[in-house]
């Protein structure tokens, strides 16, 4: 299972970094099933102010997948928000992870800084960290373990 967040058009870096390998895997016969997710719900965690952009990019990403050689006859391409069980599973997982553990996650800490989020009283000019963004790793875990 793999996927992309539809935050913009895919580019050469996506092709070299993962799309080429996905096409090779789909054609290798090595796996019975290959699932490729367009992670629109995760894209909203830091694009909630522009859901139309995410919606439009779902179409762009799907077209890019097809143009790179991904074949819907050989792999399952799906949109994250269209599988409600993923959200349900993430909700259950959220009861197994503490806020403190998420706060210690180096990737979460780095992403919060990069996006200018802050829950610190001294940084009132910055916007707070959205809960959906903060719990992004839990959502990813549910996506992976569901498949």
Spans of features found by a protein language model:
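NTP-dependent nucleotidyl-transfer catalytic core
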Residues: 1-147
């Amino acid at each position: 299972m793999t996927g992309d967040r539809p935050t913009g058009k895919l580019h050469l870096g996506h092709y070299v970094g993962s799309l080429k390998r996905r096409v090779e895997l789909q054609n290798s016969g090595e796996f019975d099933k290959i699932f490729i997710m367009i992670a629109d719900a995760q894209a909203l965690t830091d694009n909630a102010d522009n859901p139309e952009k995410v919606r439009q990019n779902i179409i762009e990403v799907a077209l890019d997948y097809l143009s790179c050689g991904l074949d819907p006859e050989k792999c399952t391409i799906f949109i994250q928000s269209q599988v409600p069980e993923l959200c349900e599973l993430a909700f259950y997982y959220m009861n197994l992870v503490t806020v403190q553990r998420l706060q210690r996650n180096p990737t979460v800490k780095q992403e919060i800084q990069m996006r200018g989020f802050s829950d610190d009283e001294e940084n009132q000019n910055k916007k707070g960290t959205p809960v959906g963004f903060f719990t992004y790793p839990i959502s990813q875990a549910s996506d992976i373990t569901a498949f």
